[in-house]
A protein has these predicted regions:
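Receiver (REC) domain active-site loop signature in two-component systems and cognate sites
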Residues: 58
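Acidic, metal-coordinating helix/loop segments flanking the phosphotransfer/catalytic sites
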Residues: 33-51
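Two-component/phosphorelay signaling modules centered on CheY-like receiver
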Residues: 14-32
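Alpha4 helix (beta4-alpha4-beta5 surface) of REC/receiver domains from two-component response regulators
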Residues: 65, 86-101
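Active-site T/S-Asp motif of two-component receiver
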Residues: 54-55
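Acidic catalytic/metal-coordinating carboxylates
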Residues: 35-36, 62-66
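C-terminal output helix
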Residues: 89, 107-117
Length: 130
């Protein structure tokens, strides 16, 4: 039996987080969801994450700050950022920094699927991120 890939969702909006969790599960992924970047960083399964989907605008630590924190800590996880407030400057910067996708809410499901495929194809196996 093939092990399902673990996708992390970090989103402070409960409705969007639950909706994204249902979508990821319907696509066959195992999902861990978190209400904040701090909750995600405290997860004992951090090293098992194959992909991270994070909201850009969150209190305390934004999705962009979370991505940079992971890079600085040597824990690169293929990341897709989602936002209700898209900004071309941020989009260009994070894509140049290695983020796989920068998506506007509401998320286009087909585009998200393409970003997930790219993220999972580009990322190292979770064991390599430990």
């Amino acid at each position: 039996m093939t092990k399902k890939l673990l996708v992390a969702i970090v989103e402070d909006d409960r409705f969007f987080r639950e909706s994204m969790r249902r979508l990821m599960r319907s696509l066959g992924y195992t999902v861990e969801d978190f209400a904040s970047a701090a909750d995600f960083l405290a997860s004992p399964r951090l090293a098992d994450m194959a992909c991270l989907i994070a909201d850009v605008q969150m209190p305390a630590m934004t999705g962009i700050e979370l991505y940079r924190h992971l890079i600085d800590a040597g824990r690169a996880i293929p990341t897709i950022l989602v936002t209700g407030y898209p900004n071309d400057v941020d989009r260009v910067r994070v894509l140049n920094d290695g983020v796989v996708g920068y998506l506007r809410k509401p998320v286009d499901e087909e585009y998200l699927k393409g970003c997930l495929r790219a993220a999972l194809a580009s990322g190292a196996s979770p064991a390599e991120n430990a």
